[in-house]
Amino acid sequence: MANIKSAKKRISVIEKKTALNRVRKSQIKTAIRRFEDAVAAGNREDAVAKFQYAQKRIYQVASKGTIHKNAAARKVAKLAQKLNGMNA
């Protein structure tokens, strides 16, 4: 356990940021899972709506620094590939 006041504060701040990052990552995973469920069901309109929401959440989380912007782009590209694969 830290003895210095600033170190104690850093521990507290890091715990808060970690919890917030965990929430944000969970939101991304949930959005992706809902999109994939819509794709599996074959419902194109629903899948498009879920894709747009997932894309929005992923880029928001990337802008906050929770995930890297390239990781966000990679996730969105994978989802777009699945969405475009529904046409075939």
Curated annotation (Swiss-Prot):
GO terms for biological process: translation. GO terms for cellular component: cytosol; small ribosomal subunit. The keyword Ribonucleoprotein applies. The keyword rRNA-binding applies. Pfam families: Ribosomal_S20p (PF01649). InterPro entries: Ribosomal_bS20, Ribosomal_bS20_sf. Belongs to the bacterial ribosomal protein bS20 family. This is Small ribosomal subunit protein bS20.
